Every structure is written in C-alpha cells, then in structure tokens.
C-alpha cells in the first residue's frame, strides 16, 4: 500500500467514523433508543439494530421510514431505515449526522463501482459483484455484473425508494447492455415486500455467457441460484486450478461446474462434477461443451455419492467440497459441524497421500476456527496427518466491513 490511492481502497470507509456525541437528533425524524450495552457494536461500525436491542421509540414510525438511533444517554449513533416486520429492525445508512438523499446514494453506487474497477481489472474475467450491501454502505442492495448484464436486488424495505436512483447510477457507471431487477428473493417476503422480476434497461439475452479466469460460463440469471452465479469464489477457483494438472479431480456441490472447469483448464486427466440439481448438471454439461472440456457431470446427492465412491474404492488426487450453507443460525451450528465432518471424512478417504482437499463453508454462523477444527477432527478420526495449505476467503469484490463480521462469511 505504498501509494495513497491504494491506501484509500484498503481502508476505505471501514475507518472509524467521526462522531458528534452532542445531544443532536436529525430534525423531524423519529428516535430509536437502544438498550444500554448495545451501543458498543454501533460505535464499532455495525450497521444493524435488532428488535430486542431497542429500549423505546419516540415519535410515529412508518415501516421503511428514516429514524435517528441514539444510545441510552441520548447520544447520536446513526441514521437508518426502520422496519417492524424485519428481525433487523433498523438498518443504518450512516453513523454521521448527514442527510439521506438521492445524491448520497448515487455517490455510494459510484464509489462501489470505482472500487471494483480498480481491484477487478483481471484478464479473462468480465464479471464481479458491484455492490455488496452493507459493506458498500447500501444496506440490503446487491448488484452483480455478468458480462454485459447487471442483476440488481433490493432486499431492504427502506432502500426500495432508491431503486431508480441506484439503477441510474449503475447505468451511468457501468454502461451495461441490460439491467435486470431481480426482486424475487425470499428475503423480500420476510421484509414484507412484493417479489417480482423486471428488466429495467435493455434486453435480456437468451443466453448469457460470462468469462472467469479465461473460462466460459453460461449463467442463468432468471432461474439460477441467488443472482445466477456465485461470484465470491473466483480467486479460489484459480487457486485450486494449480493443483489439478494431470490429476483426477472430484468437484462436489458443483453448481454450474466452475471448479471442475478450472481443473479441466489446468490439464486434469479426469474431472467429475456432482450436483443434486438436474438444471445445474445440464449447465455443467453445457459449460463443458463451451470450453471443449471433458467433464463427467453427475446428478446425485453429494453425501450419497461420496459414500458410494468410498465403498467402491475410488481415489482422487483433488477433491473439492463447496456445499451450500449448512446453517443459517448459530443454534444449528452443531448439526452443521456434523455435516461438514461427514463430507470431509468421505473426501479424505478418497484421497491418497499427497492428495488435496479444498473444502468450503459459506455461512457467517460457522466461525473459521470451528470449521477448521471440524475438518481437522475428521483427519484425526482417520489417523491422517494433514497440512493446512491456506485459509482463504471470499474474493476482493466482496469486501469485509470493519465492525460488521457478518460481511465475512466464506
């Protein structure tokens, strides 16, 4: 970080905000008082206030409306949107006393796009996450670029009013061929919002082919998971690729085959990709054809497939485990650990000495230390000595906001 330009992006707006603790509330806004002891996380930059953290409310509040948040002494903590229907009752837009305007929102969209333009200038890659919600100070907003198509999601009630502002700013900054508003996520229902999908600009192509690390990928932005594809693993796909030359590779929970395709691009001698979804397997086969790759795509439950491969005495040089989140709540962590350990046990049984296991968890509720210890306990049960080559995270277009640990999940 030798230059000021680099330093700006490294610390960004994660730097500790300046605060004025005088008894000033934004004029005419209702006031939310948080209970004593809960102000610490807000002082550290956390952007959420849960319902059980609210002591009392002053003034009439409408869901989706702006509120001022103060601590138990009445000191200013931030300004955000209120939603009584959401577990996250207040989503803070700022920890400073500044007016929330269309211009402010547009400037944050531009800053988010500028950051990605700076860090994602990678040959052979034309897709990335442009807006990552709270980490870009745009709570509940997701925008992913898939080649010429941008997919936008607005998942927080208070941000709904800024949809057109966000869309216009994305069009101005990125100049895509198509902008799709994909507001059909279940999170919107939990927020009390309507679910729908609409093209805001341009024409959605019948087939959308993106490029990642020089690999071609057909992405289904309408029927696929989330916005169509998981962009957080781009750098990890490339990292795993280096172990795959002349290797026999098994990619479990493959979705559309990204790890498998990177293995094939590395010169793997045999690649098998497994997913439980028939639609995903069809995309794996399509993507293999697009890249001229020889990949065996299997539609199966990965737990069952792994057990069957162990029983059959199969061996692989590289096994990739990239399952969906096994837990979305801390209360389910024990069950999640059992799931991660089971697939790790099977994978290790398939690996010879010197084999490589790339295993992942994509849940904030699974702490890194717990996940690593779960995998290592599988090795201990098998009396296998393992080396941890690296601990990796989501790609750099999914930045982690200081004070907001939920933004680190992979």
Q: Model-found features: residue ranges?
A:
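Conserved SAM-binding motif I beta-strand of class I
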Residues: 270-275
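Conserved class I S-adenosyl-L-methionine
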Residues: 246-253
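S-adenosyl-L-methionine
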Residues: 282-315
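Mobile active-site "lid"/loop adjacent to the S-adenosyl-L-methionine
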Residues: 316-346
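C-terminal catalytic and target-recognition region of SAM-dependent MTase-like enzymes
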Residues: 356-410
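Conserved SAM-binding loop of SAM-dependent methyltransferases across substrates and taxa
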Residues: 256-268
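Non-catalytic accessory regions of SAM-dependent methyltransferases
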Residues: 23-145
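Non-catalytic substrate-recognition/targeting regions of SAM-dependent transferases
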Residues: 131-144, 160-230, 238
